[in-house]
Design a protein with these regions (language model features):
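Bacterial N-terminal signal peptides that target proteins for export
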Residues: 1-10
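Bacterial N-terminal signal peptides
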Residues: 10-22
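Pocket-lining segment of extracytoplasmic ligand-binding domains
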Residues: 183-252
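Basic/polar N-terminal segments that are highly enriched at the extreme N-terminus
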Residues: 1-2, 23-28
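A generic, residue-level signal for flexible/boundary positions that often mark functional hotspots
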Residues: 17, 50, 137, 228-229
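Single-residue recognition of alpha-helix capping/boundary positions
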Residues: 5, 173, 239-240
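Short, glycine-/small- and polar/acidic-enriched structural segments
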Residues: 27-170, 175-178, 194-200, 216-222
């Protein structure tokens, strides 16, 4: 586990330095200020750790970590960063997905994106009733007509769609309450809704408060990868390692 984390750290920092190599060389005094955007997730720790060690300064960079609570928020404030990371769904549902270039793929967060319910939910009474989804709890009748709290334009929204599809349902069969993760969790704790769809670290908060997982992205065959991206206008003129592609074409 430690070796894997360190390997990811060194690999990611090497990628970042490769992207900004020409810039850092040209701006030795003072360091080149590099605005970046992050969510409260694992990948943020990697770059935070590198900054704590002063590795950015060693390469002529001053990396600024701007925090956002969701991918939608991060994408909506794209003018505040040139390199960032979030799930694919917020990028692809943004008004201008062609603005971003994918430069790397981070964690598979399929287990951290979850549909969560209260311990007494009828959904938990049945498991594996849906053919092809052995780890999925509940049946269509347990879900139909229920109120689901889910942040819009997020990996949670993608999971919600795939979760309903697994039951043979659509968004027309349930009541969807589009609320951001933090206020959504608070509302759920206070008794609103029948289920809530979250990603880490908010799914961890739900677990700490006794909520149960009725489904994950993995259990409904909906992979969720973190994408590392750069503003295309920033990345294009910089000579570095070949990118993984642009969001204007096929992407993960």
């Amino acid at each position: 586990m430690r070796r894997s984390t360190l390997s990811g750290l060194f690999g990611f920092f090497a990628l970042l330095l490769a992207l900004t190599a020409d810039l850092s060389a040209a701006y030795q005094e003072p360091p080149f200020k590099l605005e970046t955007g992050w969510l409260p997730e694992h990948e943020t720790f990697l770059i935070w750790y590198a900054k704590q060690k002063g590795w950015d300064k060693q390469e002529g960079l001053d990396i600024v970590l701007n925090r956002f609570d969701s991918g939608k928020d991060l994408i909506g404030n794209a003018d505040k960063w040139v390199i960032g990371a979030c799930g694919a769904f917020p990028i692809l549902t943004s008004p201008y997905p062609e603005q971003f270039t994918i430069i790397g793929v981070g964690n598979d967060e399929s287990l951290a994106n979850a549909v969560m319910v209260r311990p007494d939910s009828p959904l938990l009474d049945t498991k594996g009733a849906n053919k092809g989804y052995p780890n999925l709890y509940g049946k269509a009748d347990d879900v139909r007509g229920k109120t689901i709290i889910c942040p819009a334009s997020s990996s949670a929204q993608y999971l919600l769609t795939k979760w309903l599809t697994a039951y043979g349902l659509t968004t027309e069969d349930v009541r969807i309450q589009n609320t951001d993760a933090v206020p959504g969790l608070q509302a759920f704790f206070e008794g609103e809704g029948d289920a809530i769809v979250l990603w880490a670290p908010y799914s961890y908060t739900g677990d700490e408060h006794g909520l149960k997982v009725a489904a994950t992205s993995r259990s409904v065959n909906a992979p969720q990868s973190v994408l590392l991206m750069a503003d295309k206008d920033f990345a294009t003129p910089v000579r570095w390692l070949p990118s993984c592609g642009s969001t204007s074409g096929p992407s993960a």
